[in-house]
């Protein structure tokens, strides 16, 4: 009997091998971006203080225009798309049209509405607390945590539904890191978890959520300790975790950032977002973005550490 991963890989490669080869050429030979983030919608029902709220509101492209945009990116050799917002599930029909055009996809969602199985797509669910009280407080929406549990349980009960939890630690919730890992590693609703720390954003009104240097150092220490307890569920290598330390981030700048260099970001009107997904309003010297720790963790380390980080990145993607 064939391994299930092998049976998934064969049709995936038959469908996508030309664009995968073109993407490798873009990155390795031409030094061009090979992935992009796209704001599927410019709307969100959640009341948190995320980077999106500090950006200008725009007129969304039509479904047909977005599909055309993604098809063009595929022809150019882009191999990964991050489907974000706002809240991407504000436009569920559009998600169904664009997911799978690009070989690898993340849908980053707050889980406010029922979730759909999408081809070649991992759902990245935003969870900022181990309890409804904490999560709903951070997210500014009462009852949201209970809705996430309901929607994830329903989606997972229908069969294969690749899911990664994403937690952004801030001054209000960082002390609950261990509880979040304990809860989500045992409830059967996710395949892993990724951790970011809050990146300060101008005009986001996030002052009460910003981490002190001491808190950021403590988070790195806690993550290194917890990695031994959750070696598979915590989708971060030691190299990635150490990239969150203030001694490392204080040297970051857009010209040296692999996220800014290799991953383009677009708003819901199809216009480039300056710098990166967080925009040029982000304070790079306190960057805690998981995408940056992933890309940064593949360089400047031993061969073993680089391969481990690459394998961790692949765990967050799906061929199915």
Enumerate the language-model features and the residues they cover.
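Radical SAM enzyme [4Fe-4S]-AdoMet core and its adjacent flexible, acidic
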Residues: 1, 121, 126, 133, ...
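Conserved alpha-helical substructure of the radical SAM core
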Residues: 2-117, 313-317
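Residue-level signal for mature regions of secreted extracellular proteins and peptides
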Residues: 37, 41-44, 250, 277-280
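Glycine-centered loop/turn positions within well-structured domains
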Residues: 46, 132-133, 282
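Alpha-helix termination/capping residues and helix-transition junctions
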Residues: 75, 117, 186-187, 281
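Flexible loop residues that form catalytic
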Residues: 86, 128, 198, 292
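Flexible mid-to-C-terminal extensions adjoining Fe-S/redox cofactors in radical SAM and related proteins
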Residues: 252-320
């Amino acid at each position: 009997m064939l391994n299930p991963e092998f049976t998934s890989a064969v049709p995936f490669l038959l469908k996508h091998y030309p664009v995968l080869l073109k993407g490798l050429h873009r990155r390795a030979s031409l030094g061009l971006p090979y992935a992009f983030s796209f704001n599927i919608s410019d709307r969100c029902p959640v009341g948190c203080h995320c980077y999106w709220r500090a950006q200008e509101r725009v007129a969304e492209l039509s479904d047909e225009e977005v599909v055309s945009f993604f098809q063009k990116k595929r022809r150019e050799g882009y191999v990964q798309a991050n489907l974000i917002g706002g809240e991407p599930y504000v436009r569920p029909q559009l998600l169904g049209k664009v997911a799978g055009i690009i070989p690898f996809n993340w849908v980053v969602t707050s889980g406010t509405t029922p979730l759909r199985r999408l081809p070649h797509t991992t759902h990245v669910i935003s969870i900022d607390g181990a309890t409804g009280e904490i999560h709903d407080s951070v997210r500014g929406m009462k009852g949201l945590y209970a809705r996430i549990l309901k929607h994830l349980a329903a989606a997972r009960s229908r069969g294969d539904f690749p899911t990664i939890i994403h937690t952004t630690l801030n001054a209000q919730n960082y002390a609950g890191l261990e509880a979040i890992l304990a809860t989500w590693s045992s409830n059967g609703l996710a395949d892993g978890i990724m951790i970011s720390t809050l990146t300060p954003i101008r005009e986001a009104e996030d002052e009460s959520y910003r981490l002190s240097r001491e808190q950021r150092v403590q988070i790195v220490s806690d993550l290194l300790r917890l990695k031994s307890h959750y070696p598979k569920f915590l989708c971060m290598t030691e190299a990635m975790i150490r990239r969150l330390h203030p001694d490392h981030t204080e040297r970051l700048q857009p010209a040296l950032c692999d996220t800014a260099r290799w991953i383009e970001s677009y708003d819901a009107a199809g216009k480039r977002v300056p710098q990166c997904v967080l925009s040029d309003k982000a304070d790079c010297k306190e960057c805690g973005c998981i995408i940056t720790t992933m890309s940064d963790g593949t360089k400047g380390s031993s061969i073993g550490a680089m391969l481990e980080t690459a394998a961790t990145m692949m765990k967050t993607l799906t061929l199915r």
